[in-house]
């Protein structure tokens, strides 16, 4: 029961992806780093610049040649190994 309750409070992968799709201008599963940062801060908890940098360093794939990042892998990494801030 406690695991289900915890998962419900955290949201699920599909919920996060659906929210990010609202910000995905190209509708191709990628976003520019600044767009992803804006979306995460608009939808989630308030993080300072250092926390955002840590989060991206731990969970982010490199940008492609055009500066886009696939957000599904980012969410998968974030959910499988959450970043803990002190």
Swiss-Prot record:
PROSITE patterns: EF_HAND_2
GO terms assigned for molecular function: calcium ion binding
Alphabetical list of InterPro entries matching this protein: CALM/Myosin/TropC-like, EF-hand-dom_pair, EF_hand_dom
Quaternary structure and interacting proteins, as annotated: Myosin is a hexamer of 2 heavy chains and 4 light chains.
SUPFAM superfamilies, per the entry: EF-hand
Boundaries of every EF-hand domain copy: 11-46
Cross-referenced Pfam families: EF-hand_7
Gene3D superfamilies associated with the record: EF-hand (1.10.238.10)
Keyword Repeat: yes
Keyword vocabulary terms for this entry: Motor protein, Muscle protein, Myosin, Repeat
Organism encoding this protein: Drosophila subobscura
Protein name: Myosin light chain alkali
A Gene Ontology cellular-component term: muscle myosin complex
Keyword Repeat assigned: yes
């Amino acid at each position: 029961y406690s695991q289900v309750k915890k998962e419900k409070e955290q949201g699920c992968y599909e919920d996060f992806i659906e929210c990010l799709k609202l910000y995905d201008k190209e509708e191709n599963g990628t976003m520019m780093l600044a767009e992803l940062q804006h979306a995460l801060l608009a939808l989630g908890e308030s993080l300072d610049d250092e926390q955002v940098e840590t989060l991206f360093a731990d969970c982010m794939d490199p940008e492609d040649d055009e500066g886009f990042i696939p957000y599904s892998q980012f969410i998968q990494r974030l959910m499988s190994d959450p970043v803990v801030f002190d």
